[in-house]
Every structure is written in structure tokens, then in C-alpha cells.
């Protein structure tokens, strides 16, 4: 029988409040395999992020979408003072495990990890005088749906995130190239700029429209899982994640508004300066905002 319900996430994943799309544990486990550890980060990404933070004299960093902690671990290893938060306790357990395993290293013993929600971030996180940099990378912000249909929760979340940045500090936030996805129905053909994973076998893209407006993009991942076959051979695991399709122009307006317009803003396409109409089609847009007041 045909399933008449369009499932936006893998079964067992929470659907109330800010959705934890990794709540069943299995998606979190497979995602950890997919992204790997800090060694699986591309050299280009690592060099770009570390260079950006050091160029602006950043030391105290808030990772507002730390997931399993892979970016935070990289920053802690590089000498930054890091606070890491995420709404998914299933994802955070991997970060907490790494901190425990490396607790004898002072930098890891001082690493702060908390569960927090973007919609209540101003209450969940004590920012003090603000962080030198706040990062929200890996298409993480697109996990927040537009439940009310007016993007009010997007605006609230971005305002809360921006409030964590000290005057003169940075917000670094990204999203996939949804302009391309919505116009073609598939993701750009380039490589993943963040992960060197060789376990991905297939990613299927679907676009859900409501009243002729793109409302959601779902990605169905098929990932090779080593040693799960009956004879010890690799098996396969599938899971679905849903995202709000932020287009470049509209997201630019949202994120600038979060700072009340008091910011310097630049857009990169796959870590390179982006110019509308350029020949190269980026997989990700990265927004770098410097708070000016």
C-alpha cells in the first residue's frame, strides 16, 4: 500500500519544538560515520576557518551547532577556548565522550559542552561580554523548519545567535546552494567541501512545495557502514534529513536584520569570494558577518 504520509525525517525522530532529527540515535551514529573525525575535515576547510579566526584575533568561540563535536574538537586542538552547544543530546554524547577520553589534556578539560536551543539561546547560554566568534556551519541552520510559515522562528533564532557575538566579533554561518537545488531539483555536482568521507553511496534530493512555494528539501542518505553485513562485509544504512531551503538573497536579508544592519557582511562560495553570475556553481554559501557596534 502506498504510504500517504510524507515523512520528513527518519522514523523515531522527534517532531515537537525544535526538531531533533537525530533523536533516534541511529541517524546520529551513521552521521558520525559519514563525517568522520577531525582528520576527515578537508584541508581547505580547516585552513580557511583557522585562518579567518586568527586573522580577526578570535580566541573565544561558540559553536552553536556542534553536533558530534568535530569542528569544536579541531578548534580545541588548535588552542581556541570553545563552548559547544547543540539541541540533540544524541549528537552531543559523541562530543562528551571525546572530552572525557581526553580530559587529562587541559584544553579538553576546559571545553564547555551544553545542550541548547536556538529559540531560547539567550537564556540557555551565558555569553558574558560576547564571544569573539560564533560558528554555525555544515548547513546546520537549515535544520530549523518554518513551522509558522512566516519565518518568524528563523528571525528569532538568528537574532539570538547574533546576540552572542561581541562588538567587533564574527558570525560565520552557511547553507547549501538552495537556489541551484530549487531550480534544478538536485544538488550541485561539486565535492563536499567539509568532509572527505568515502562512505556515501547515494544522496537523493526531494523538494516539497506548499502553495507553489518551496517549503522543504529532504536528503535521503545511503551510507556504507563497515562490518555490518552477515559475513562482516560492509552493509548499508539509510536515513532522511529535512531542511528549510534558504536562498541566498532572502537569507542575506535575514542574517543582516539579526544584527539590526550593524555589521559588515561578505559571502563566500565554497570558501572563495562569490560574485552573482559567476561560472563556478558553489555547493555552499558561507556568510561572514562582523558586528560593528
UniProtKB/Swiss-Prot annotation:
The modification N6-succinyllysine is found at residues 46, 191, 196, 201. One of its GO terms (biological process) is S-adenosylmethionine metabolic process. It is found in: Cytoplasm. It is an enzyme of class 2 (transferase). It comes from Mus musculus. Pfam families: Methyltransf_31 (PF13847). The gene is Gnmt. One of its GO terms (molecular function) is folic acid binding. This is Glycine N-methyltransferase. The keyword Methyltransferase applies. S-adenosyl-L-methionine binds at residues 22, 31, 34, 41, 65, 86-88, 117-118, 137-140, 176, 221.
Amino acid at each position: 500500500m502506498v504510504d500517504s504520509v510524507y515523512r520528513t525525517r527518519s522514523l523515531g525522530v522527534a517532531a515537537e519544538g525544535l526538531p531533533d532529527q537525530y533523536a533516534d540515535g541511529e541517524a546520529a551514529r551513521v552521521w558520525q560515520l559519514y563525517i568522520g573525525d577531525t582528520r576527515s575535515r578537508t584541508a581547505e576547510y580547516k585552513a580557511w576557518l583557522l585562518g579567518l579566526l586568527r586573522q580577526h584575533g578570535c580566541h573565544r568561540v561558540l559553536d552553536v551547532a556542534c553536533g558530534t563535536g568535530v569542528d569544536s574538537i579541531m578548534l580545541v586542538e588548535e588552542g581556541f577556548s570553545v563552548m559547544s552547544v547543540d539541541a540533540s543530546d544524541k549528537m552531543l554524547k559523541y562530543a562528551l565522550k571525546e572530552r572525557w577520553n581526553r580530559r587529562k589534556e587541559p584544553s579538553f578539560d576546559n571545553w564547555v559542552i551544553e545542550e541548547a536551543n536556538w529559540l531560547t539561546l539567550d537564556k540557555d547560554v551565558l555569553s558574558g561580554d560576547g564571544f569573539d566568534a560564533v560558528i554555525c556551519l555544515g548547513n546546520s541552520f537549515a535544520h530549523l523548519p518554518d513551522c509558522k510559515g512566516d519565518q518568524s522562528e528563523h528571525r528569532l533564532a538568528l537574532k539570538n545567535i547574533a546576540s552572542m557575538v561581541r562588538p567587533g566579533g564574527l558570525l560565520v554561518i552557511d547553507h547549501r546552494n538552495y537556489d541551484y537545488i530549487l531550480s534544478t531539483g538536485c544538488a550541485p555536482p561539486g565535492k563536499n567541501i567539509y568532509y572527505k568521507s568515502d562512505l556515501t553511496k547515494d544522496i537523493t534530493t526531494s523538494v516539497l512545495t506548499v502553495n507553489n512555494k518551496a517549503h522543504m528539501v529532504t536528503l535521503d542518505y545511503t551510507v556504507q557502514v563497515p562490518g555490518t553485513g552477515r559475513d562482516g562485509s560492509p552493509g548499508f544504512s539509510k536515513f532522511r534529513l529535512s531542511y528549510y531551503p534558504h536562498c541566498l538573497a532572502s537569507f542575506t536579508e535575514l542574517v543582516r536584520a539579526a544584527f539590526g544592519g550593524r555589521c559588515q557582511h561578505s559571502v563566500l562560495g565554497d570558501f572563495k569570494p562569490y560574485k552573482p553570475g559567476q561560472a563556478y556553481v558553489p555547493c555552499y554559501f558561507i556568510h561572514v558577518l562582523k558586528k560593528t557596534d
